[in-house]
Amino acid sequence: AMRKKSGYCRGGRGIRAYGCRHAPTGTKIQFIFIKAEQQMKEASRVQAVIEALEEILQDKRPADNILDKYFKDRRYIGSKDRRFIADTVWKIIRSRMKYSEALGSAFSARTAAALCFAQEDLDLLFNGEEYAPAPLSKEEKAALKAAEQFEDFSEAALYECPQWLFEKIGNTRLLDALNTTAPADVRANLTDRNHARERLKKEGLFFSPTPFSPIGLRSEDRVNLNNCMTYQDGEIEVMDEASQLISLLCRIKAHHKIIDYCAGAGGKALAFGSLLHNDGLIWAHDINEERLGRIKKRAERLDILNIKTIKNVQDKDYTRFIIDAPCSGSGTWRRTPDAKFRITPQRLREILGIQAEILEFGAEHTAAGGRLIYITCSVLPEENERQIESFLAKHPEFSPIDHKELWRETLDIPLYPFDDTRWLKFSPLNTKTDGFFFCAMKKAVAES
């Protein structure tokens, strides 16, 4: 059960605005506080939140992986309790910087959870009984009282972005959009999306066509596809609309020699296979063989038969050399809000070097007249346009194609929601998608 209260956010800064995004002074908002149902049951839920949150704060692994393992190791936790625990953990993660600044040196999984439940009787929740959190100390209670009144948030905390990344991105509207919750996007696989949509509807799952992608469906609701037969039968695959569009914009044909060079678990390679209806051949390469090994299992479910994995890339005549480059992942913060705390300045420098090396390799292995395609799921300029500008300065044989023309000939959509024709920058602002960068460059044919 939930209890809602209305109130005003003091300058958009009050600690009680944690359940919402930054709002200007005087903006009416809805606070959502968690109402206890049965106190002992609720206390054990709070303890579970603390345990899961502690692991996330201490571990470098993605939060969703940690939560999955937490619940897998505790199969006795029911579905409603799992959802409650996961929702609370994600709520805290999405406002981690505000919690941290408000609590100061007292910030911990315990105090963050207590602050999240501050509208409840904390002495009943933190009662020290079996499966319940230990009682709050005087110091913790004092810190919580101060945190509830705290308003002096840094601008970076208001937009939930580490200071060094806040300075790089700068665009507060974009950061605000990256703090929202992403919809559930899927693409049709080897079928018409209307057919997939009707089948989903029969299973009680309601999707609408995506606004740009002709193969996509979207639900604004939380969707669990684990027991969905449409998904299990391979008629749909989870894929953000921007990623779907990028797959289409690669303009692959069955006669092309295609390589998905940083294939990972094969998301784009599998989309290519579907677009070609199993005609032609797609080579998939990744330095992480474990990730690459997942492609086979995914391809079996999707009935994709035209993908082959490759360890060593030697041929230099690829007509589509596609680089889905390793990156900061800053464009996916709507789905992975913890990722912003795992990236460091040093790691970003390493990634930039890797991206440049991969571009050099791709340039060497792209056929004359072919396209070298560079993709990231980042919104950081140094990973995107600056990386391309640096590459083009050293490689006059490559030139960006006209992306406005590419967009219109691929999608037959008059609206062009981008500011540049040299590349495409998808974001929750302009395309209502994750943040992606796409640049297709053509390699000149040597004059005879």
Predicted features, each with a name:
Residues T27-S448:
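S-adenosylmethionine
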